[in-house]
């Protein structure tokens, strides 16, 4: 008898805002571009391995890259990760 092992994968698919959290200025355009480049690299690996994942995205990132997000949603679960969390406010949680 063979037992099948399962793993659940989730990724943050968002703007690259980590430098901002440490006081370094990075433009929103650059944040979005770096986030998109990382997302494409992740997507390539998941596609090669034929592995689904849950992708937590900010609405701001999804609005910037709607075509890519629609494409990702055909194979992966896409979930909310607030509107924009660099300068997190309670309003970011509102629908």
Model region roles, listed by residue range:
Residues 1-95:
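Catalytic alpha-helical scaffold of carbohydrate-active enzymes acting on polysaccharides/glycoconjugates
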């Amino acid at each position: 008898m063979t037992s099948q092992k399962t793993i659940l994968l989730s990724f943050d698919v968002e703007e690259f805002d980590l430098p901002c959290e440490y006081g370094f200025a990075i433009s929103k355009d650059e944040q979005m571009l770096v986030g998109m480049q990382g997302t494409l690299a992740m997507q390539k690996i998941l596609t090669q391995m034929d592995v689904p994942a849950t992708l937590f995205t900010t609405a701001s990132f999804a609005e910037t890259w709607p075509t890519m997000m629609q494409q990702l949603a055909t194979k992966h679960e896409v979930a909310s990760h607030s509107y924009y969390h660099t300068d997190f406010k309670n309003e970011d949680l509102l629908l």
